[in-house]
Amino acid sequence: MKKNLLHILSLLLVMLTGATLTAKADSYKVAPMTAGKVTVSPNDEFVNAPINITNYGTNPVKQITYTLYDFDTQESSEPQTIDFETPFDNMQQVMIPIKPGKSLGKSDVIFNVTEVDGHPNETSITYTYIERWTVLQAAKKRVVFEDVTGLWCQYCPRGIAIMESLERLYPDDFIGISIHDGDALATNAYSSMLSSTWSNTNRPLIMCARDEKVNTHDGQSNFKYELDKTASFDISVKATYDGKDINVTSSVLPCLDVEEGTEYDVAYVLTADGLKNDNWGQANRVGEWNDQVLPEYDRFKGNESTLYGLEFNQVAIDSKGVQYGVDGSLTRPYTVGTMQTHKVTFENISQHKLIQDKSKLNVCALIIKKVTNGDKIKATIENAAKCRVDVGETGIKQIGNNETNTVTGYYSLDGQRLNTPAKGITIVRYADGSTRKVRN
């Protein structure tokens, strides 16, 4: 009896000790990741700075408390609390409101996570610097996806669906360029990159800002991450067809100071929408897309291994300085607030037999950021703009009585197809492939 009692007491002691050790093992550690630049106008109340925070503690985080230290005013804010509806185990993005500085220019703000779930933050580095720029004009950020594709590629419908869905959902923020390789829609527009940077890659190769590969089926995470970045330059572009050539003018406004040793130039890509041919058959991986919810995948569902009658948009036709930008198109010093303009010409447009309707031509102007490391140059897309080529009366395809630009569909902001326009904002898609946001 005494032995049994001692055994039970020993077990209780072990259990209590284990519980005590478990309680002591709880840790509360949240570390903010490096934050990028944010731009804010003196007239803005604040702008939201996206910051990723990582949970290194033992439990899912329900709440954090933080302070902001403003180097401009040399003052710390009152503690602010963020509650998370869904506690997070690993990484979470938070939006931190940043007020404009007292004067134009750069001034840092320190974001410091002081508490985690009501406990002092135990991580070694609890803060990060936010690089705030107070500017008269902030750059309008647009994200460029380049999709290397081919009719022969059975997995390439993924790129088609991603590119067209992002253009439908974010017509003001997204620019897509479709680069065909080894098929009837192939051109020389990207030959320099297809023979070098992208020569030994699988298809489709979908690049976001030439910085990250897109490996998902909707491209949303890449797009939103890039859109949150602050661009150092604002850019606009216009293009006019004179009956023979397309004359292009880009206007670039430096909005932020840039790092020494980083160079910028402008590249230009001529693209075409609405390309169709009854002989063009797109290879299709049967069954690959059946679980996808974006409506752009619907045409690829079913049992057709080759699809005919598709309309191809955003197709690269010609380019100028596509890999590194046109040399000298932007010149140092990149003085904040001082506009730089540049002109190029796409000559003899009639040589491009792939073009079917000159009223569906676009010019994309890409600001190429170049960082040299030894004998290698890393080139990414800092920002971009796109315009429809103004053809006047010269290149417009005549529309017959049965070819009006009719509405072909209504969509909600999250991509769901609607039978009729919804109350609020509806995305309207037209027969020519264009989209427009309409408020009802």
Predicted regions and their residues:
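Short, conserved sequence motifs used for protein processing/export or organelle targeting and
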Residues: 175-392
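Residue-level detector of functionally pivotal "anchor" positions at catalytic/ligand-binding pockets or at interdomain
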Residues: 27-34, 132-143, 385-414
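Terminal processing/anchoring signals of secreted or surface-associated proteins
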Residues: 1, 25, 153, 206, ...
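Terminal connector regions
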Residues: 102-137, 365-374
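Intrinsically disordered, low-complexity Pro/Gly/Ser/Thr-rich segments with frequent PxxP/GP/PP motifs
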Residues: 74-102
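C-terminal outer-membrane/trafficking sorting elements
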Residues: 394-440
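Local sequence-structure signature of Cys/Sec-based thiol-disulfide redox active-site neighborhoods
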Residues: 135-174
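Bacterial Sec-dependent N-terminal signal peptides
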Residues: 1-28
